[in-house]
Amino acid sequence: MTWILSTGMGPHEDKYAKHERATFKKTYSSMKTLSLNHLTAKQHMLMALCRDISLLPPLTYIFTSLRKAWRVSMRTSITLYEPQSLRDAFTYFWQKLNSAYDNNSSFEGASQKAVNGDGKDSLLLSALTTARASEYLLCSLWCLVSLYLSYAILDSLMVRWIVKYSTVAAILRMFSMSLIIVTLELLLLSSLSPELDYFLHTWILISCVLTAVYIWQSYLTSDLRYIRNQEGEVQEDTNVPEETEDYEDGEDDADEDSHVVVADESTVDVPSNDSLSDNSDGGLFPVNRPSVSHSQSPKRPKKYPKKAFNFTTKRTIDLYKITVLCVVPVGLASFITMLGLLRNLFIQRLDVEQLERILHEMHPPA
C-alpha cells in the first residue's frame, strides 16, 4: 500500500541541473576552445605572435614572386614567342661573332665585344635559361601551401603544449618551433637558390618537408583525447544511489505538481484520532495530517566534472585527417604546377627547335 505525500522539493533544482549540464556541454565543445580559455588576453596575444613568426618567410616570398612575375611579363626587350624576332636576334648574334673572327681577333675578345655591344646578346643567351613569369606565379602558390602547413602544424602543437605544460613553457616552445621552421626555410632558400632565381623547386621542397612534419605532429598529438561524459556529463558520488529515469526525464511533471511523491505504508504513522473514509477496495487511504518519519527528500548526488583531456599511452596515425587537411592541398598545388610546367616545357621546346633551324641555316652542312 502506498501513500501520496507532499515534499518540499522545488522545481528550481531540476532547472539548475539542466542549466549546469547545458553550460558544461557548451564550454567543452572543442579542444582548442577549452585550451585557449585558460589563457589571459596577454598570454593569448603572445602565443599568437610566436605562432605567426613562422608565417613571415612565406608571406614575404609570395609578394616577391608576384613582383618578379610582373617584371618578367613586362619585359619587352626581346619576345621569345615570335619566330621572326627570335630569328633576327640570333642572326644579329652570329653576325657579330663572324665579323669578330674575320678581323683575326681571339674568341674571348669577340665574346667580350659582343657582350659589350647593345646587350642583346647576353639577353638572348639568358632568355632560354631564366625563369618565366608562370614559374614565379606557381612559386607563389607553393608559398601559400607552405604558409598553410606551418600554421596547421603550430596550431595543433599549441593545444597539446597548453594542456600538458605551463603557459610560459608553451609560449617558449611555440617561439622555438617557429624559429626552427624559419631557419629551415631560409637555409634551403640560401643553399638552393642563392641568386633568387630558382624559387619554384625550393618552395616545393619546403612544402614536402612541412608535409612530413605535419604527419609527425599528427602522430605526436594523437594521444591527446577529449573526454565527454554520457548522461549529464558528470560523475556521481558512489555512496548515493543513482537517480531513476523518471526523475531525470520527468521535468514537465515536476512543474505541474512538484510536491507529490509516492511512499510506502510502512513509512507513515497514522494517528488514531484521524478520520479515515470507508473504502470497500481497501486500497489508498487519504491522510489529513500525516506524520512522516522519512519525509526528507533523497540526497542529491554530488557532481564532479571529469577532466576534459586525458593522455593515452598508444599513439595512432589519423589517415583521414592527414588526407583531408594535408594531402589534398598539396595534391591540388601539384596538379596546377604540373599543368604550368607542361606549358613551359612545350614553349621551351619550340624555342630550341627554332634555334636549331637558325644554326643549320647559318652553318649548312658541307
Curated annotation (Swiss-Prot):
Compositionally biased residues, Acidic residues: 233-256
Bilayer topology term: Multi-pass membrane protein
Tagged with keyword Membrane: yes
Glycosites: N103, N104
Post-translational modification: N-glycosylated.
Annotated function: Involved in oxidative stress resistance and N-glycosylation.
Protein name (record): N-glycosylation protein EOS1
Organism: Saccharomyces cerevisiae (strain ATCC 204508 / S288c) (Baker's yeast)
Organism taxonomic ancestry: Eukaryota, Fungi, Dikarya, Ascomycota, Saccharomycotina
